[in-house]
A protein has these predicted regions:
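A mid-sequence, solvent-exposed acidic-amphipathic segment
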Residues: 143-144, 148
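Short secondary-structure boundary/capping segments
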Residues: 149, 190-191
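Domain-scale signature associated with acetyltransferase and cell-envelope carbohydrate enzymes
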Residues: 1-137, 160-162, 169, 179, ...
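A generic "structured core" feature
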Residues: 177-178, 182-188
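Flexible glycine-rich beta->alpha loop in the catalytic core of nucleotide-sugar glycosyltransferases
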Residues: 142, 187-188, 194
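Glycine-rich NAD(P)-binding loop of Rossmann-like domains
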Residues: 149-159
Length: 214
């Protein structure tokens, strides 16, 4: 791992752990680098495990990115749950609005410059890989009227276990992705899917009975 001990922000790590975890925070389960901006810490963070260094925020991701110049942003006024051994790379932006809930399952990773914007409810399963430059967003932020009907501004997103999200993919409100699916790079994913082990693109299911190795 390119980033080492010298890149850890001791003050941010102490502040984060004691703010959210109280006495459990003395084990420093979350390690934060200097390039992470703790924009808003008014919300609630819960962990599956409080082992030292269990969660890493702001460390290296893919080798083709200049991680030294990437700024991660942590902006949580709602609720965030992180499973064991979740890795959040440099440049990742996480925003959880008031009364919203974001859950990321164990052994999942979010790569460089991806963004998760949660204003309702987003559930990400275990062993999920989110590649670089992705956007997962459960809200339109502006209400849309279709004829005489006002559409919902936000809808929950569900992503199952062992899903691989290719680079530069957008996952929008109301999406449901079953276990062990692949989201094609560059796709705009909408709608609900029920079939496991599929390759899904903007146009829908492209292949069936696919699998991938982490």
């Amino acid at each position: 791992m390119g980033k080492g001990i010298r890149d850890i922000s001791i003050l941010k790590t102490i502040r984060f752990n004691l703010r959210y975890f109280g006495k459990k925070g003395v084990y420093f389960p979350v390690i934060i680098t200097k390039n992470v901006i703790l924009k808003n810490m008014q919300g609630k963070v819960e962990l599956e495990s409080y082992k030292t260094g269990n969660i890493r925020i702001g460390f290296d991701g893919t080798g083709i990115c200049d991680v030294k110049n990437q700024r991660s942003i942590f902006d949580v006024t709602g609720s965030l749950f992180l499973g064991e051994n979740v890795k959040i790379a440099a440049g990742v932006k996480i925003g959880v609005g008031e009364k919203a809930s974001l859950k990321i399952g164990r052994e999942s990773s979010i790569n460089v410059n991806s963004q998760i914007i949660c204003m309702n409810n987003i559930s990400i399963g275990e062993g999920v890989i989110i590649s670089w430059d992705n956007l997962i967003m459960d809200s339109d932020f502006h209400q849309i009227q279709e004829q005489t009907t006002l559409k919902d501004v936000s809808k929950p997103i569900f992503i199952g276990d062992k899903v691989w999200i290719g680079c530069r993919t957008m996952v929008l409100k109301g999406v449901n992705i079953p276990n062990e699916c692949i989201l094609a790079a560059g796709g705009v994913i909408t709608g609900k899917y029920t079939e496991k082990n599929c390759l899904i693109s903007s146009a829908g299911i492209k292949k069936h009975n696919v699998s991938w190795i982490r």
